[in-house]
Every structure is written in C-alpha cells, then in structure tokens.
C-alpha cells in the first residue's frame, strides 16, 4: 500500500489506481483538437458544405481552432461519446446537415482509424503524469485505465509509447454498453484487477471521472487540472484536486 499527499490533503492505504486517459496522462487539447478538426473536415466533405463553417462546427464540438484549446464548457469536456453525437446531430441541423447517430458513429470511427495510423503526429503524453504512473507502478500498485475513448485506440497508444508494463487493464468505450458515468466500466476494471474500491483511487481531469468512481463505490477521486477544466472549478467536485500530478508526494 502507498499514501498520497499534498499540502492540502492526504489519502492513505492505496492498493489500486484507475486513470482516465485524455487530459490526465495524454495532452487533451492537442489530441482532441486534432481529432475534432479531422471529424469536421470529413463532415464538410461528405455533406458537400463550404469550408466557411469549419470554425463553427469545431466550436459545436467544444474546440476553438484559433486558440488550439478545448472549451471547458464544451460537449467533449462534459459528456461521453454517445451523448456528444446526440447533441452534435442537432447542432448540425443549423447548417442544413441532417444525419443520424449511426452515420455520425461511422464518421467518427472512420476518422479514428485515420487518426491512429498517424498516432505519433497527434498524440502527446503529459510528462509529469507518466512520471507519476511510473513511480506508483514501481511501488507495486495495480493500475488500470477507464476511458470513454475506444479500447482499441487506447491499446494502440500504449503500444506506441511502449507502456505495456505500466497498465494491467484497459476499459474503453466498447468494453460496455453503459456510459462511463454509470460506473459500470469502472466496476469492470475493479473486477478485472480483483481490486477493493475502498483501497482504490480514481485519477481524472473532469467531473465525469468523479461520478464514474462514486457510482462504482470508490470514495476518493483526485482531479488534475491538466485537461479542460481549471483547478478552482474542479474543487467544486472533489477536495482532492491538484494542478499537476507532480505536486503529489508518494510514500
């Protein structure tokens, strides 16, 4: 077991840590910014629309192409993929684009295939997060990933960066028909790790991660402000909040 603490809080007797991916140990702004641009370009192409709506469609998906940042109140920050598609489908009607959830799923999957063939171009780790993961791993902690991104995509990321020895289990979007917020995917990770929720901590960058952990019986979630939401806002959800995982002391 290990203990984690900062000048503001302490969590003791940890055996297992579950991590969110994007915004937690992968640079979310760059990753999802590039993904959003590819999705929007494909939609403009398929529906034969003018490129003048490119910026507006990016903003609908919660990304500002002018700043290169994801919006803290954008749908990508707040919801899982199925909800994002449902909202985006209705936003597209404003631009005379009429589609279905199934068609948008197909477009998103098509773009993901292209995206992950060029992973080295689009994916950047958060160095201090990877260092933290390596430290707790060296102390014998069981580590899992629970993400609303695809398991296939996450596995490719792990393979690309040669992180196979860092993670014991990956639960992704296709691992369950239930959303991440339901807590079911998190329960799956706990079960596969044979982990006790009482000695498990979730680490993520958004309220979604807190909700997911709570619904799985995990009492403590550390929220890190390396994603779309600043630390003060995250403190409204969890008392265990940091600007960076590098500020956490491990013993």
Predicted stretch roles:
Residues 101-105, 126, 130, 164, ...:
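Short, structured helix-loop boundary elements
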Residues 17-19, 106-111, 120, 129-158, ...:
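Substrate-recognition element of Asp-dependent hydrolases with the DxDx(T/V) motif
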Residues 11-127, 139:
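N-terminal helical cap/lid subdomain that shapes the substrate entry/recognition surface
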Residues 54-63, 131, 139, 145, ...:
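Surface-exposed, interaction-prone regions with an acidic/low-complexity signature
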Residues 1-17, 30, 134, 151-251:
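Asp-based, Mg2+/Mn2+-dependent phosphohydrolase catalytic module
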Residues 24, 147, 205:
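Conserved G/P- and acidic residue-centered "switch" motifs that form tight phosphate/ATP-binding loops
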């Amino acid at each position: 077991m290990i203990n984690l603490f900062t000048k503001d809080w302490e969590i003791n007797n940890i055996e297992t840590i579950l991590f969110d991916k994007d915004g937690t140990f992968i640079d979310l702004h760059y990753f999802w910014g590039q993904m959003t641009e590819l999705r929007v370009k494909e939609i403009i192409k398929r529906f034969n629309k003018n490129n003048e709506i490119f910026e507006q469609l990016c903003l609908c998906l919660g990304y500002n192409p002018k700043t290169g940042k994801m919006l803290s109140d954008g749908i990508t920050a707040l919801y899982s993929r199925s909800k994002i598609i449902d909202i985006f489908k209705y936003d597209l009607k404003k631009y005379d684009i009429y589609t279905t959830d199934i068609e948008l799923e197909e477009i998103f999957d098509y773009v993901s295939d292209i995206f992950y063939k060029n992973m080295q171009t689009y994916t950047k780790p958060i160095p201090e997060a990877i260092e933290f993961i390596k430290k707790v791993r060296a102390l014998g902690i069981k580590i899992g990933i629970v993400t609303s991104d695809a398991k296939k995509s996450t596995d490719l990321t792990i393979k690309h960066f040669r992180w196979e020895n860092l993670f014991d289990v990956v639960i992704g979007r296709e691992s369950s028909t239930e959303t991440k917020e339901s807590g079911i995917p998190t329960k799956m990770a706990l079960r596969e790790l044979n982990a006790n929720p009482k000695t498990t901590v979730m680490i993520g960058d958004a309220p979604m991660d807190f909700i997911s952990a709570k619904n799985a019986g995990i009492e403590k979630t550390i929220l890190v402000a390396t994603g779309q939401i600043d630390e003060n806002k995250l403190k409204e959800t969890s008392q265990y909040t940091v600007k960076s995982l590098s500020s956490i002391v491990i013993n």
